[in-house]
Amino acid sequence: QTQTRHLYNSVPEEIVASYNGNIRTYGTDKHPEFAMTEYGVHHAYTRANYKNDIKAVIQKFYPSILVTTDWDNHMDHLALSLMVDEVLGELLREDTSYHPLVLKAQAYNGKWEGHPDYYSENNVTELVNEADGTDHIHSLDKWEERIRFSVPDQCKTALLKKNILYKAAKKYRSQSVDLKAIQFINLDMVYWRRPTESLSYRAKIETSSGNAAYLNDFKCVDCSDIIHGMWVYDAGIWIPEKTDAEKKIVVTLEKKARIREIHLFENPDEDCIIHRIKITFGNGCVIHTGELNHDGSRTVIKVPEMELTERVELVLEEVEGSAAGLTEIEIYETIREIEDYRLPLPLWNETPPLYGGNRSQLPW
């Protein structure tokens, strides 16, 4: 990216040079990159190409499990996370049969900058950053909601040099990856899930004002300037106009459904608060929410047993702050259990301790 604008925040066809001056994708003679393999050309570094290549590789394989970076403290990792969300928002609208298990993980906190604890009996993932002494976890990722996998035996050897991950790290000629192995190799692997079964993605959404398209684009946050404000999620927010007395959202589903849950994401700006929302269903059922989570994380609204409906109306009855609004609405009839997927690793069966708990009580 350039020093002034990240590729993710650039206009679609603008060519953005990398730090080392490259303006096109590249690989090696033996291992050409995706664009060369698929199209026979190197792709210019533009936002449009970046997005289209990510979409093309997903469409080529339609993986049932998709693993990507999360809200990492690295601008390129964050850009990838946001772009994958953007692409998935389109794919989930275009193909009603595609509901992958989406798992996101941080690469720095707890991994690249994790504790050097390979030889510790408590060698499990903690979201600590040894480089700056923080234990940052993004508010959208609740530590107690993490999904943990147990690593196979070849990834937990008594000697580091026999570990298959260490052997793989030794193959890299840059980044000194092998020197970081004692930090990023753990007995568990930790991810956060983004469900993909929401009925909202193909729903018609109308609002009394503001940009309704933000409410079902799969992006629960967005950033207008990754380089200069990486942790400022100030974009992609439905904000009703100040003169809007209704502050209303009407969701019309493709077909009637027995709604079980509604997930709402509030504008993460700490000065913007939604105190209460009135939700009216097409079958006559009405519920009122309390305050939404103010950190931008999902607020889960449990819906009582009721008849099928295809209409959901939400009215912001009490708000605080001129930019109070929502980044996403998810409506669920069902969410597939993670055990129903063909998982590559066994789930961690121990009850995970809360972040910051007593390490001596861990199962290792």
Question: What residue spans do the PLM features occupy?
Answer:
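Short beta-strand-plus-loop segments that form exposed binding edges in beta-rich domains
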Residues: 315-322
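Hydrophobic residues in beta-strands and at strand termini
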Residues: 252-255, 281, 303, 316, ...
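Metal-dependent de-N-acetylase/amidase catalytic core
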Residues: 3-204, 210, 341-350, 355-358
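Disordered, acidic Ser/Thr/Pro-rich linker "stalks" and the adjacent N-terminal cap
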Residues: 193-256, 265-276, 293, 328-364
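Short, conserved beta-strand segments of beta-strand-rich sandwich/propeller modules, principally
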Residues: 261, 311-313
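Extracellular carbohydrate recognition and processing domains
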Residues: 286-304
